[in-house]
Swiss-Prot record:
Modified residues (Alanine amide): A69
Lineage: superkingdom: Eukaryota
Function: Possesses a potent antimicrobial activity against Gram-positive and Gram-negative bacteria. Probably acts by disturbing membrane functions with its amphipathic structure.
Similarity comment text for this entry: Belongs to the frog skin active peptide (FSAP) family. Dermaseptin subfamily.
Record has Metal-binding as a keyword: no
Cellular component GO terms held in the UniProt record: extracellular region
Residue segments, region Disordered: 24-43
UniProt entry keywords in alphabetical sequence: Amidation, Amphibian defense peptide, Antibiotic, Antimicrobial, Cleavage on pair of basic residues, Secreted, Signal
Name of this chain's protein: Dermaseptin-A4
Biased composition (Acidic residues): 30-39
Compartments in which it is found: Secreted
């Protein structure tokens, strides 16, 4: 009977350790996904900012060309 108790406790202990390791890995994966999502958002914001800057620069250049063309 004592052998069965020890075996049962060993199985339960190993199961709990395995479950704990799986939960830890799951948390790490979730954190990595959150980090990936945040970096994608930053990348998207940076891209939009560059597009806006490019648009403003293009408009300024076009305005300068129109001004120069109007003076001649």
């Amino acid at each position: 009977m004592a052998f069965l108790k020890k075996s049962l406790f060993l199985v339960l202990f190993l199961g709990m350790v395995s479950l704990s390791i799986c939960e830890e890995e799951k948390r790490e994966e979730e954190n990595e996904q959150e980090d990936d999502e945040q970096s994608e958002e930053k990348r998207g914001m940076f891209t939009n900012m560059l597009k806006g800057i490019g648009k403003l620069a293009g408009q300024a250049a076009l305005g300068a060309v129109k001004t120069l063309a109007g003076e001649q």
